[in-house]
Regions:
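Short amphipathic alpha-helical segments at helix-loop
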Residues: 29-33, 81, 142
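Conserved amphipathic alpha-helical segments that form helical-bundle/coiled-coil interaction surfaces
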Residues: 41-141, 149-164, 168
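Short linear motifs at protein or domain termini
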Residues: 1-47, 54, 58, 170
């Protein structure tokens, strides 16, 4: 519940303690309760991802990139299997993005990024046309530690989100 409460299965729901890693932030809570402007959220996500991929390329260890590569391979395998569900692909997509947050080695960026990604959870559809290709481009750029290509892929990905959103408004 975004750091406000902790749910402990079998024990109940409790107000989060100060030791909680994702402390409640009134500004983030304001985003939750206001009407969501998808275009504004997309702009925020774009800014965060552009900076995030730079941090990942600069900070991730080779071992972390191997784990990221394994996660991408799982995602690609699910997308290649026509019988796979969009739900499973979306789950792996989210895991990949959360892993990017972890391996940027900046807990503030990670927490904000994961928060923003969670706001997009219901709209994520990795089966949209072009999404798999742009994910592969972004991943390849990260694996090659190529900041310019990674930033280009983030821009391309953002355009796909905007187009998909516009298509739902028609």
């Amino acid at each position: 519940a975004y750091g406000v409460v902790e749910i402990k299965q079998g024990h109940g729901t409790f107000i989060s303690s100060a030791s909680n890693k994702r402390l409640f932030d009134p500004q983030l809570f304001q985003i939750l309760i206001q009407d969501r402007d998808y275009i504004s959220l997309t702009q925020v996500r774009h800014l965060l991802e552009e900076g995030l991929v730079k941090l990942v390329i600069q900070s991730a260890t080779d071992e972390e990139l191997i784990l990221l590569d394994q996660k991408m391979n799982e995602f690609v395998e699910v997308l290649a299997n026509n019988g796979s569900s969009a739900k499973e692909a979306a789950r792996l997509d989210l895991e990949y993005h959360r892993m990017l947050g972890r391996i940027c080695h900046n807990s503030i960026v990670e927490n904000i990024y994961v928060f923003v990604i969670d706001l997009f959870t219901k709209t994520i559809n990795p089966i949209h046309e072009g999404v798999d290709t742009v994910h592969q481009r972004l991943h390849s750029a990260i694996m090659n530690r190529d900041i310019a290509q990674a930033v280009d892929a983030v821009h391309e990905h953002t355009e796909i989100w905007k187009q998909a959103y516009q298509a739902t408004k028609k």
